[in-house]
């Protein structure tokens, strides 16, 4: 199922159009289903539990021979790895710091991949969301950063993040785009009519 329908994506694109009529900023929005599949996490947890749990139990009780202990460790590894591959279990096992790091890394890659660093006056701005991580970030190029402090975007990010948690992704995008537009119209007002980047929502499945 799509994160946002075609109609909802059109609404986001139209909101970007309205903002860019009032500012030289080039606004790009990106919505990712997740920043990573975290396929390595089940193996890490299975390795730790498979190695330590049977060994610790056997150390205390001395029930198993060396061959039996190895078999118990292998069996534990397989069972834990299969259980941990369940998406909800995997999500629970991934530390918040890792989830945020992966989402932040993807946001920075998207800033480059969407050519936001190549605008003529350095006026690129990215509104990035990773749904699975409940992560929102606004990244700006130097032409905007020189006029608006990084802290300017924090309140918008906090509001949008809560909306993502509540499943209100479309409302979050529309509200954030509008709020960005109000600031950008004042600090990076329109001086030309050139549109350097496509006005659309980039969806990463």
Please state what every model-predicted region is.
Residues 58-93:
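Transmembrane alpha-helices and immediately adjacent membrane-cytoplasm interface residues
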Residues 108-140:
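Acidic, Ser/Thr-rich low-complexity segments on the non-lumenal side of membrane proteins
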Residues 38-49:
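Select subsegments of transmembrane alpha-helices in polytopic membrane proteins
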Residues 24, 127, 176:
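Residue-level signature of catalytic and energy-coupling elements of molecular machines
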Residues 96-114:
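Membrane-cytosol interface motif
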Residues 3-27:
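Short, charged cytosolic
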Residues 4, 142-201:
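A membrane-cytosol interface segment of integral membrane proteins
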Residues 82-93, 136-140, 156-158, 162:
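Acidic/polar active-site rim loop that often engages polyanionic ligands
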């Amino acid at each position: 199922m799509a994160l946002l329908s075609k109609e909802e994506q059109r609404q986001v694109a139209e909101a970007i159009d309205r903002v860019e009529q009032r500012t030289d900023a080039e606004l790009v929005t990106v919505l990712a289903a997740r920043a990573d599949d975290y396929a390595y996490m089940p193996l890490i947890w299975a390795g730790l539990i498979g190695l330590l749990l049977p060994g610790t139990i056997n150390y205390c009780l001395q029930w198993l021979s060396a061959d039996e202990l190895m078999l118990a460790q292998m069996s534990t590894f397989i069972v834990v790895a299969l259980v941990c591959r369940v998406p909800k279990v995997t999500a629970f096992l991934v530390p918040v710091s890792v989830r945020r790091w992966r989402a932040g890394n993807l946001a920075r890659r998207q800033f480059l991949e969407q050519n936001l660093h190549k605008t003529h006056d350095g006026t690129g701005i990215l509104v990035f969301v990773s749904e699975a991580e409940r992560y929102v970030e606004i990244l700006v190029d130097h032409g905007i950063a020189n006029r608006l402090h990084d802290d300017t975007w924090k309140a918008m990010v906090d509001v949008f993040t809560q909306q993502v948690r509540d499943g209100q992704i479309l409302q979050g995008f529309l509200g954030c785009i509008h709020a960005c537009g109000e600031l950008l119209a004042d600090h990076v007002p329109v001086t030309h009519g050139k549109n350097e980047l496509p006005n659309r929502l980039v969806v990463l499945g």
